[in-house]
A protein has these predicted regions:
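Non-globular targeting/processing and membrane-anchoring segments
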Residues: 1-178
């Protein structure tokens, strides 16, 4: 205790963290943090033919290896982020982790809310939905921040994640996993 403190108990406090504040499940975390912008992007299946800093149509790959990801739809890929130019585009990711988080925000060019739908192995997440998504996989980007999209229960396995944006003018920055 600090010298001179009076009336301070020695008991410890229990802190319960929810959502993205909960500690990562390190024993089942096999997928690393991933940046979407070309300055730091790794394991991306769709950038080999990309034209950076201009609109480009990306095809959805038929299959991804573990920790590989891809854009689909028309995006402008910039150094730190990618911005969706037309509705119906999204990101697919083959991952192995309990939680999927994505840092994203509305683009400066006017959108105030961008609705999205997430799927895991092609289906709505159901009970595996994160705090920013309902059981049907629906959510909305309203500001630039980290969104918790998936929170699975055990057993954790390699899974296919997809986020599809129902309107354009969203920016995606990075994935984190827990």
């Amino acid at each position: 205790m600090e010298s001179g403190a009076v009336g301070v108990g020695a008991e410890s406090a229990t802190i319960h963290a929810d959502g993205f504040e909960a500690a990562a499940d390190w024993s089942d975390l096999l997928t690393p943090e991933t940046y979407v912008g070309y300055d730091r992007a790794e394991n991306v299946a769709s950038y080999n033919e990309a034209t950076f800093d201009t609109p480009h149509e990306y095809a959805r790959p038929s299959r991804l290896s573990l920790n590989e990801w891809s854009l689909f739809g028309e995006w402008t890929v910039m150094g730190e982020a990618a911005e969706l130019n037309r509705s119906g585009g999204g990101v697919v990711y083959r991952f192995h982790a309990r939680d999927v988080h994505l840092v994203m925000g509305t683009a400066a060019s006017g959108a105030t809310s961008v609705p999205f739908r997430v799927r895991i192995d092609g289906e709505p997440p159901g009970a595996a939905h994160g705090v920013d998504v309902d059981e049907q996989g629906l959510g909305a980007v309203t500001e630039r921040r980290l969104y918790q999209l998936i929170r699975q229960t055990t057993p954790i396995a390699d899974r296919d994640f997809e986020i599809e944006f129902l309107d354009p003018r969203v920016q995606v920055f990075s994935f984190t996993f827990g």
